[in-house]
Design a protein with these regions (language model features):
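Conserved beta-strand hairpin/beta-sheet module of binuclear metal-dependent hydrolase folds
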Residues: 2-52
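Active-site HxH/HxHxD metal-binding segment of metal-dependent hydrolases
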Residues: 43, 47-136
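Intrinsically disordered, low-complexity boundary segments flanking structured domains
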Residues: 1-3, 113-114
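Intrinsically disordered, low-complexity N-terminal regions enriched in serine/proline/glycine
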Residues: 1, 11-12, 59, 83
Length: 136
């Protein structure tokens, strides 16, 4: 199901349960928009990158729901890419227990601490216009 689809120019998307965007920055470097729901999604993205000879330089998270940041930790560990998110989304990406805590109103019980509500933490930086590639 993890299929790379060309849109136009240097823009692609990865067909998956939680679609991901991919932008070629040059012949070898790419950035990813969201990273899927877990390390398995990250592994499949890494396979697509390797098959195309691409190096992941950054992940831009649109928001901090677990199905959009779940592959961050795996991909960052494998590629040393930077991860960016805006505002409070950056904080939730760094501290994913906040996602189910907001739902519950306090530290979430075990039933709310699973990969569908709480991704693994990743080292995200604040997304500002200055960190975006030219043309974004």
């Amino acid at each position: 199901m993890y299929e790379l689809n060309h849109i136009i120019g240097n823009s692609y998307y990865i067909q998956s349960p939680s679609k991901m965007g991919l932008v070629k920055l040059n012949d070898t470097d790419v950035c990813l928009i969201d990273s899927g729901n877990d390390k398995d999604a990250g592994r499949k993205v890494r396979q697509l990158l390797d098959a195309n000879g691409w190096h992941l330089t950054a992940i831009y998270n649109t928001h901090s729901n677990a199905d959009h940041i779940g592959g961050n930790r795996y991909l960052q560990g494998q590629t040393k890419c930077k991860i960016y998110a805006q505002g409070i989304e950056c904080d939730i990406t760094r501290h994913p227990v906040l996602e189910p805590a907001f739902l519950y109103g306090g530290f979430p019980p075990k039933d709310l601490r699973h990969k569908f509500l709480m991704a693994q933490e990743s080292d995200a930086k604040e997304l500002t216009p200055g960190v975006l590639p030219e043309g974004f």
